[in-house]
Amino acid sequence: MMDDSFKNYWMNKLKYFSLFILLFAIYWFPDVILGYPEIYLKSLVGYDRQATATWIFLGNMAISLFLGILICYKLGYYKNTLSIFKIKNILFLLFTTIVLFIIYFFTFTYYNSHFITPGIAKEQAAYSRQIVFPFVQFISFAICAPIFEEAAFRTTIYRFFKNDKIAFIVSSISFAWMHTGANPILIVYLPMSVVLTLIYHRRRVLGESILVHCLMNALLPTIIVFLQTITGLYYL
């Protein structure tokens, strides 16, 4: 009995560790077209090159979303999703979304006032826009990223660690670190990660953190400009 319990324990760990890797492999699948355009699009130039890359990217993205959502659904990741639409939960998510935008605004303003955004990040963004049409990048950023990242960094990590406190810490730090690495911009991503983890931690409903993450990614550029306009705060 002891041997079976020990085996099941480690098999469960292996299952969710492998799932974490699998989710990211599926998530990054569409980016193959961005990484190797000279292989897939070498005979095309200009608009034809960008249009073809866009359709390939959209097709790959559709496959990734289908596989990712199917896997998460089969594993019960979307349990209680419809409960999001209860009034008290909607109000909570609205409040935390507003708080998240405000926190991000102040941390981002502070970061921009004291540090320089790495050139590589700017180059990568510009390069992506040259390969595919901008709306595709928006879909990837506002829809795909939240679905896969929340599934990996929230539910998968919480199932890997049975201790909720450890899961909370690992989820918050690893999500932020994955986006920044050893870079000062961690001061922007870590508070955001903590809030997103708190949203999931509250009821263990993945749909809630996905929804807030989607709103964050979709509206962030507009909200930043709006808050700068009404506060007059550009440096901190």
From Swiss-Prot:
Query: Which UniProt keywords are present, listed alphabetically?
Result: Cell membrane, Membrane, Transmembrane, Transmembrane helix
Q: Which GO terms describe its biological process?
A: CAAX-box protein maturation
Its cellular-component GO annotations read: plasma membrane
Example GO molecular function? endopeptidase activity
* Cell compartments where the protein resides: Cell membrane
Pfam families, sorted: Rce1-like
What residue ranges are annotated as transmembrane? Answer: 16-36, 51-71, 90-110, 131-151, 180-200, 210-230
Topological type in the membrane: Multi-pass membrane protein
State the family it belongs to.
Belongs to the UPF0177 family.
What's the protein called, per UniProt?
UPF0177 protein YaiH
Give the organism the record lists: Lactococcus lactis subsp. lactis (strain IL1403) (Streptococcus lactis)
